[in-house]
Design a protein with these regions (language model features):
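Hydrophobic anchor at the start of a short beta-strand
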Residues: 16, 82, 130
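Primarily the HKD phosphodiesterase
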Residues: 45-107
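Short, flexible loop segments at the rims of nucleotide/cofactor-binding pockets, characterized by
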Residues: 28-35, 58-62, 107-110
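Conserved beta-strand termini and adjacent loop/short-helix elements that scaffold enzyme active sites
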Residues: 19-21, 85-87, 115-117
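HKD (HxKxxxxD) catalytic microenvironment of the phospholipase D
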Residues: 53, 110-156
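Cysteine/selenocysteine-centered motifs that mediate thiol-based redox chemistry or coordinate metal-sulfur cofactors
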Residues: 157-166
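A conserved SF2-helicase RecA2
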Residues: 1-26
Length: 166
């Protein structure tokens, strides 16, 4: 239900109200995105990470994981800690399908944590930028999906602590 409202707001041109104390630089902008227009800003945020990236997704796709591996190699060299939380698949066929993706990530030094009941799609960068919505950042996406980019240390830190609980 919430995701449908978010899509509707995006289509109507709504935006996220900025905190009055924030400056208006592009890096501090909170915004609504569609599946069609999120990728370039998402990539910029990922590549600008200084210390930590946490991505929580229910599933992985080979194409998106390969793309992420290519872009994250330089981050790992810089010492950025990258963790991927992915849903532990409940049947063997699905588990076999994502196993190569998990191996690709782990082989370059990304920590992959498989957990039950992961359904939310969240990315948190440096405990200050959070991407949240129904776009699977490392998996399959469909038309009309959307997400929010929220720049707020307090919200990002609080959500991070909740998704990292086992």
């Amino acid at each position: 239900m919430y995701q449908n409202r978010l899509k509707g707001y995006k289509h109507l041109g709504y935006s996220i109200k900025q905190n009055i104390s924030e400056n208006t630089e592009r890096q501090t902008e909170s915004k609504l995105y569609s599946e069609e227009d999120y990728k370039s800003d998402f990539q910029k945020d990922i590549l600008s990470a200084a210390s930590k990236i946490i991505i929580s997704v229910p599933c992985l796709s080979k194409v998106n994981v390969q793309e992420f591996v290519l872009s994250s190699t330089t981050l790992l060299v810089k010492g950025v800690n990258i963790q991927i939380l992915v849903r532990k698949q409940d049947d063997d066929a699905k588990q076999k399908k994502i196993a190569p993706c998990i191996s690709m990530l782990e082989n370059i030094g990304i920590k992959v944590i498989e957990q039950e009941n992961i359904s939310q799609k969240i990315t948190i960068i440096d405990e200050k930028i959070m991407w949240y919505g129904n776009i699977n950042f490392l998996g399959y996406t469909e038309n009309e999906e959307c997400c929010m980019r929220i720049v707020d240390n307090k919200i990002a830190s609080e959500i991070e602590s909740k998704i990292l609980k086992p």
